[in-house]
Structure formats: structure tokens, C-alpha cells
């Protein structure tokens, strides 16, 4: 198990790229979507400030507005495609019927299993802040296992617990594209979920851990663009901790 201990998603990106600089850490692996470089063992990313969720590395060229809207769409428990394709038409590529997303996380959080799992987690932790049974499920073995659709959930399970009056969250992921998934959409969506639940519990946001079983990057234009970034505290200090440069920004942690 490799552990990437990061301040935020920007920090994690540079540390993740550093992992793929050493050929002893990865192998070339074919996939249904093309050739990847895959870490030889699972990777856990630890975010110590998960609320610093916006990717500010210019070469990554992430769209924080779309990620934020998609995060709200998830918290609303929706699976309809139209609100997303209005902003990003290519989301249609992940739909089997052109109208919905099969693996929509928010829908699975709030409706798919015939219960609002988010509400239950909040109620459980309000009743017992020491509870260790707060498991939010996204993977349905009855329908997802051996399914050949376009959108099978990559994130499978989320665990919540309160320690030292902070809400910690661990997300388990079967397959994680480092650039588009782990340090793109996942860092935004899951930290928004953590913040939402913490706000209802009136506790601080703790650590967010993302456990990625298959941690990989695809051989594509984005990889070619960012792979040369290196961890250099003098050259890339403005990239590694960009939030230090946001003068006057105040974050209120409950």
C-alpha cells in the first residue's frame, strides 16, 4: 500500500505525479479504455485539508464550476443526465439510455437502496458520536457485479466516524484514474459530502482518505501535458500550496 499524505488536491497531484516518475512503482496495464500506467499496489491519498478542493494547477485545466455543480447534483440525490449535459455534453458518453446515469452516486446515497443513507448516517452520529457502523454504500452486488454498462460505480463504499470532534471520512474505490477521477472529480464531490454531513453534525471537517485499488493514469494528451511537473519547493511552491496565495480568503470550519 502506497500512502500519499497531502495538504490538499493540488499537493496530491504533484505527489501522485512523483509516484509515476519511478518505474519501480507502476506497470503498463491494458484496460477497456486504453493503455494505462497502473501503480503496483493500492494507493491511499490522505487529504488533511479536504475543503481546499479546487484544482489550481493550470496544466491540469480542471473546471471547478462543473465539479461544484455536479457535487450539488449528487447531494440532491439525482441521476438525470440533463443538468450535467447542459454544462458538459460529453457526459452523454457515460449513459446507457441517454437520460440517466446508472452509477450516479447521489442517487445511490439517497434513493437507490430505498433509504436516504446520508440522513441515516447523520442520525446515527448524532445519537452516538462514537459509532463505527456508519457505512454509506454505493456498490450493488446484485446488479453491478458482471454488469457491462457504461457507468458502473468506481467508488464503492464510504465510512464515517467522529474523532476529536472532527468528522473523518474514508472512501473506497475499485478503479481510480488519478487525473480525471481521484484528483479531479472525486476530490471535489466527496469533500462536499463530508462537509455537508459535518455541518449537520456541527463538528469540524477531519481527514479525508481515498483508498484506490487500481490507481492509474491513461496514456493520453492530459498525461503528456502534466507528467513533467516535478516536486520542487522553490520552483513549484505556488502550485504546491496555492491556497496560501489567496489573500483575504477566510474559511470557517465549524
Region locations from a protein language model:
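Terminal, non-catalytic protein-protein interaction segments that mediate quaternary/complex assembly
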Residues: 1-254
Amino acid at each position: 500500500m502506497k500512502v500519499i499524505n497531502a495538504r490538499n488536491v493540488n499537493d496530491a497531484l504533484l505527489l501522485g505525479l512523483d509516484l509515476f516518475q519511478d518505474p519501480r512503482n507502476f506497470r503498463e496495464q491494458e484496460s477497456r479504455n486504453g493503455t494505462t500506467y497502473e501503480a503496483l499496489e493500492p494507493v491511499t491519498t490522505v487529504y488533511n485539508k479536504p475543503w481546499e478542493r479546487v484544482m489550481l494547477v493550470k496544466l491540469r485545466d480542471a473546471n471547478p464550476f462543473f465539479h461544484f455543480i455536479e457535487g450539488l447534483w449528487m447531494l440532491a440525490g439525482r441521476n438525470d443526465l440533463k443538468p450535467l449535459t447542459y454544462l458538459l455534453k460529453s457526459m452523454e458518453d457515460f449513459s446507457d439510455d441517454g437520460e440517466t446515469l446508472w452509477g450516479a452516486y447521489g442517487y445511490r446515497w439517497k434513493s437507490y437502496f430505498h433509504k436516504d443513507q446520508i440522513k441515516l448516517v447523520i442520525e446515527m452520529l448524532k445519537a452516538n458520536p462514537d459509532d463505527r457502523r456508519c457505512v454509506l454504500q454505493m456498490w450493488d452486488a446484485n446488479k453491478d457485479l458482471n454488469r457491462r454498462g457504461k457507468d458502473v460505480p468506481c467508488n464503492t463504499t464510504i465510512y464515517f466516524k467522529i474523532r476529536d470532534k472532527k468528522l473523518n471520512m474514508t472512501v473506497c474505490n475499485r478503479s481510480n484514474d488519478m487525473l480525471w477521477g481521484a484528483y479531479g472529480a472525486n476530490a471535489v464531490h466527496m469533500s462536499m459530502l463530508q462537509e455537508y454531513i459535518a455541518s449537520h453534525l456541527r463538528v469540524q471537517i477531519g481527514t479525508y482518505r481515498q483508498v484506490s485499488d487500481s490507481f492509474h493514469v491513461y496514456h493520453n494528451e492530459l498525461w503528456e501535458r502534466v507528467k513533467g511537473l516535478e516536486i520542487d519547493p522553490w520552483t513549484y511552491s505556488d502550485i504546491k500550496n496555492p491556497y496560501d496565495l489567496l489573500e483575504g480568503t477566510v474559511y470557517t470550519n465549524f
